[in-house]
Amino acid sequence: MSKVCVLTGKRPKYGNTVSHANNHVRTRFEPNLHTKKIWIEEEKRFVKVKLSAKAMKIIAKTGTAQLAKLLK
């Protein structure tokens, strides 16, 4: 299962979690992804996509036209 946002392209980042004692432990920081069913007006159908929280805000502001272009 891919952890990549369809619209923004966000993917996992790698880094360290640092404790109070300054111990470094390698970790993987996951993007805030949600699987959503979105109605694409241009195609008259629902599309199931993985979106980050930022992408959901973009769609709420601008609409699904940008997403429809990416899916073609």
UniProtKB/Swiss-Prot annotation:
Q: Does the keyword 4Fe-4S apply?
A: no
Q: Name one GO cellular component term.
A: ribonucleoprotein complex
Query: By its UniProt entry, which Gene3D superfamilies does this protein fall under?
Result: Ribosomal protein L28/L24 (2.30.170.40)
Q: Which InterPro entries match?
A: Ribosomal_bL28, Ribosomal_bL28/bL31-like_sf, Ribosomal_bL28_bact-type, Ribosomal_bL28_sf
Q: Could you tell me the Gene Ontology terms of the biological process aspect for this record? A: translation
Q: Which UniProt keywords apply?
A: Ribonucleoprotein, Ribosomal protein
Classification via Pfam families = Ribosomal_L28
Q: Which GO terms describe its molecular function?
A: structural constituent of ribosome
Key word NAD present in the record? no
Origin superkingdom: Bacteria
Family label: Belongs to the bacterial ribosomal protein bL28 family.
What PANTHER family does UniProt report for this protein, alphabetically? 39S RIBOSOMAL PROTEIN L28, MITOCHONDRIAL, LARGE RIBOSOMAL SUBUNIT PROTEIN BL28M
NCBIfam families this protein is in? Answer: L28
The identity of this protein, by name, is: Large ribosomal subunit protein bL28
- Species the sequence originates in: Chlorobium phaeobacteroides (strain DSM 266 / SMG 266 / 2430)
Lineage, highest ranks first: Bacteria, Pseudomonadati, Chlorobiota, Chlorobiia, Chlorobiales
